[in-house]
Amino acid sequence: MNSTHHHGMYTSLHLWNRSSHGLHGNASESLGKGHSDGGCYEQLFVSPEVFVTLGVISLLENILVIVAIAKNKNLHSPMYFFICSLAVADMLVSVSNGSETIVITLLNSTDTDAQSFTVNIDNVIDSVICSSLLASICSLLSIAVDRYFTIFYALQYHNIMTVRRVGIIISCIWAACTVSGVLFIIYSDSSAVIICLITMFFTMLVLMASLYVHMFLMARLHIKRIAVLPGTGTIRQGANMKGAITLTILIGVFVVCWAPFFLHLLFYISCPQNPYCVCFMSHFNLYLILIMCNAVIDPLIYALRSQELRKTFKEIICFYPLGGICELPGRY
């Protein structure tokens, strides 16, 4: 087994390794046909320590988000419950990827034949990662629908999005995504699974784009209608628009971090022997790093966009003996 194949194992996902393994074969074929033998065909190596470090950072950040939302009753709203679901999904994707890197590195450093055990561990962790990816997509869609209701059905919103209903939605999301993730890994040898994942990703983008075009085109009209009513409708509507903008940023980061991976899958099933596709697929490990970066960036977005969340973060952090961090100015 050559070194590049060992490096490819750090990416691990059984479903995703399948495309990585195919990459080496296709690269060899391309080289055999006379193409340049530049480093573009070599699988990009990323140190396992990078995966582990990002996994630990993501774990700490997203736990902080979950604890903050649970602790502060002012954050007990549908949007933040969906954000909590997204934080759990982000954390599982990043931590599972880092954990699998550790497991494979340890197994590769031993002389014993642990191939069967490695495959079983891969399947379990890959199921978690796949389920979490689906949950991330569904959570983002749920937040988008929630923002849509707050803007277009502001007066009926609290009757539509009750805490009980939100809890049922989140439970159904995770139940469906868990079953789907397990099935995807079981049938990961089929190209239909990859096509299904790619279709889900791009369908999500189309739905989001359609929703936001309608949302922002009509938002001003609804703001004007709410403004003529007594009370604090204008203030409430402004807060709702801020939430919609926050979601826009989250979706933008999600697309930037996940699109290269889905393009990798798309190229694998559409042009696996094309030298340009092979060159793009040789950076597979980098695309996994981008995925883990998404889990690290999202909590920072929550904090930057929510003063209430920043305040709760500080209260939680100051609970621990972290030196003079509590002496920082109250203003962010």
Curated annotation (Swiss-Prot):
Predominant localisation class: membrane
Q: Which residues form the signal peptide?
A: none
Please list the GO biological process terms of this entry. Answer: adenylate cyclase-activating G protein-coupled receptor signaling pathway; diet induced thermogenesis; energy reserve metabolic process; feeding behavior; insulin secretion; negative regulation of feeding behavior; positive regulation of bone resorption; regulation of eating behavior
What is the membrane topology here? Multi-pass membrane protein
**Stretches assigned to the Cytoplasmic side:** 70-81, 146-165, 216-248, 305-332
Q: In which tissues is it expressed?
A: Brain, enriched in the striatum, nucleus accumbens, and periaqueductal gray.
The regions listed as transmembrane in this protein's record are 44-69, 82-106, 124-145, 166-186, 192-215, 249-271, 281-304
Please report which positions carry a covalently bound lipid of kind S-palmitoyl cysteine: C318
What quaternary arrangement does the UniProt entry report? Homodimer; disulfide-linked, also forms higher order oligomers. Interacts with GNAS. Interacts with ATRNL1. Interacts with MGRN1; this interaction competes with GNAS-binding and thus inhibits agonist-induced cAMP production. Interacts with MRAP and MRAP2; these associated factors increase ligand-sensitivity and generation of cAMP.
Give the protein's recorded name.
Answer: Melanocortin receptor 4
| Organism name | Rattus norvegicus
Q: Gene name, please?
A: Mc4r
